[in-house]
């Protein structure tokens, strides 16, 4: 409940900035995006402790969730100059929509955080037997081979993560949970 009370003023500030476009509002919007992302991580961290109570599997349109996650990150994506390549998706899948959206938001934020000079983010699907696999890939700086075994550990930021001040080491941990 307390997280939602924090998110309400963040959303209100974002709307005010969007309605009053000035030079300084762009920077404020980016900072609000970061604040919102950390708040989301706190919310999902709390939820991850009791997924059996929170997880709700339903039929969902994958394209809708992908486009919602892109919209969630529009200021980050625009500021970063990230080029998006999103494949048309007709698939419906059974999953928890809010968790899929959270995971996509984390992956998009990581793609922006660890981008190269001319960043590209690709989102597509492919079928594997009776499953639909959602593929999110970028051309970022990558993950050191020595860090790969630990990237899903709680609090682990890795070699590249330690160079970026906004790394918490909680995002991929929550994605895996």
Short names for language-model regions:
Residues 58, 83-92:
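Conserved catalytic submotifs in the C-terminal HATPase_c
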Residues 156-166:
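Glycine-rich ATP-lid/hinge loop adjacent to the conserved G-boxes
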Residues 74-85:
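Short conserved segments within the C-terminal catalytic ATPase subdomain
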Residues 138:
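Acidic ATP/Mg2+-coordinating residue in the GHKL
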Residues 118-130:
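Short beta-strand/loop element within the Bergerat-fold HATPase_c
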Residues 111-112:
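Short helix-loop "hinge" at the ATP-lid/N-box region of the Bergerat-fold HATPase_c
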Residues 143-155:
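Short conserved segment of the HATPase_c
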